[in-house]
């Protein structure tokens, strides 16, 4: 990887602008999951320990661009960092005209998406952000697939632009899966829609030995094979695509095991009774909401035989306890495996959190869309600009 790392640069006394992904869930002003903050803390602390004057940028949620909304404010994040760092931390709302910051001090800037032009990678905005620093550090893997002012444009115009430790770790973990994976490789791809993961599914059938579809994706494959799925979520417009992927998988020597038994309900509800059924017994008014015990055993056996595991998406509606057995069993099987395992995506991370398996998965990616695009073989714009800038950087 032709990238200059943050650790290659002397940061002492320099203004260091770090783009992190601090987009955490906040309810009633309280952070409900600090996973992304914990992932970002080592980078921020390292820069402060080096004697840098540190400024942090991030987005939070999806506010209307250019409009302040308190529920999308990064102030609770600044409070969290203040409590978890032994350095002074200030929260600054207006920063585009300049920020006074001292070595050994951290300034947390307000949500970058409150700035008009952020998503469009506005040149004037990017230059204002770049003027805040001597060194720009891109550490937000979760937004590296977006060419925006705070991820791409600022890297174009900053005096020096480098990759942060978290970004490097993410890319190295994915590289281990993409460049020299140990076989057999098993991928679990769940979620509601084939359409959102069509490119990924096509890419994976040429790369992995076993591709286990889950959730609405599995339902679409089942329907494409002529099985009764009742009123289950599926995509009628993508049945031909599903059939094409099954044919492609056969040509490539990739196994796509489909459920042989399922757990159904009559409504999508936390209080809905759950019933185990063989696939041949699914009724016209049934809704498939999880995989059954026989399928769980089959999938767990496949996972135990793997040397590399990729996990993106649940295999059932794990938010409802009666439909969580499949996802829980898959998660535990991955955690217990000796294989190199990488997990990514919001629902996947929520499941890892729920079952307290953070320490047992080889690598947990902080990215959703960026994670998928890497697996699809795409170049991430924010990484590409760092590679371009690396050609001209002096590391002193």
From Swiss-Prot:
Residues noted as binding ATP in the record, renumbered to the chain: 197, 319, 345-348
Associated pathway: Carbohydrate degradation; glycolysis; pyruvate from D-glyceraldehyde 3-phosphate: step 2/5
Catalytic reaction annotation: (2R)-3-phosphoglycerate + ATP = (2R)-3-phospho-glyceroyl phosphate + ADP
Entry GO terms, CC: cytosol
Location(s), subcellular: Cytoplasm
MF GO annotations: ADP binding; ATP binding; phosphoglycerate kinase activity
Family: Belongs to the phosphoglycerate kinase family.
HAMAP family: Phosphoglyc_kinase
Annotated protein name in UniProt: Phosphoglycerate kinase
Gene label: pgk
């Amino acid at each position: 990887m032709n990238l200059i790392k943050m650790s290659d640069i002397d940061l002492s006394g320099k203004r260091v602008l770090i783009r992190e992904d601090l987009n955490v869930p906040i309810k009633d002003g309280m952070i409900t999951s600090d996973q992304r903050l914990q992932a970002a803390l080592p980078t921020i602390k390292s820069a402060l320990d080096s004697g840098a004057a540190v400024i942090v940028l991030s987005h939070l949620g999806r506010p209307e661009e250019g409009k302040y909304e308190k529920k999308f404010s990064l102030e609770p994040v600044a409070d969290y960092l203040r409590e978890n760092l032994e350095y002074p931390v200030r929260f600054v709302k207006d920063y585009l005209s300049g920020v006074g910051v001292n070595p050994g001090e951290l300034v947390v800037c307000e949500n970058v998406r409150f700035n008009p032009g952020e998503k469009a990678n506005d040149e004037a905005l990017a230059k204002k952000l770049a003027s805040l620093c001597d060194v720009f550090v891109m550490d937000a893997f979760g937004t590296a697939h977006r060419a925006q002012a705070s991820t791409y444009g600022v890297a174009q115009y900053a005096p020096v632009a480098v990759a942060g430790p978290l970004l490097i770790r993410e890319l190295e973990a994915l590289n281990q899966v993409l460049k020299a994976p140990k076989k057999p490789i098993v991928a679990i791809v769940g979620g509601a829609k084939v359409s959102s993961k069509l490119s990924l599914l096509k890419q994976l059938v040429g790369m992995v030995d076993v591709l286990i579809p889950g959730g609405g994706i599995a339902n679409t494959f089942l329907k494409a094979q002529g099985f009764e799925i009742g009123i289950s979520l599926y995509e009628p417009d993508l049945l031909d695509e599903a059939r094409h992927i099954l044919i492609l998988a056969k040509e490539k020597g990739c196994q796509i095991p489909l459920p042989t038994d399922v757990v159904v309900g009559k409504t999508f509800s936390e209080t809905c009774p759950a019933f185990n059924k063989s696939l041949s017994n699914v009724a016209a008014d049934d809704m498939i909401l999880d995989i059954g015990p026989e399928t769980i055993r089959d999938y767990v056996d496949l996972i135990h035989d793997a040397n590399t595991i990729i996990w993106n998406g649940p295999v059932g509606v794990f938010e409802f306890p009666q439909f969580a057995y499949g996802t829980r069993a898959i998660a535990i099987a991955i955690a217990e495996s000796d294989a190199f395992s990488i997990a990514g995506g919001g629902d996947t991370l929520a499941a890892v959190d729920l079952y307290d398996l953070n320490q047992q998965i080889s690598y947990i990616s902080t990215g959703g869309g960026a994670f998928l695009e890497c697996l699809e073989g795409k170049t991430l714009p924010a990484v590409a600009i760092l590679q371009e800038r690396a050609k001209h950087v002096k590391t002193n």
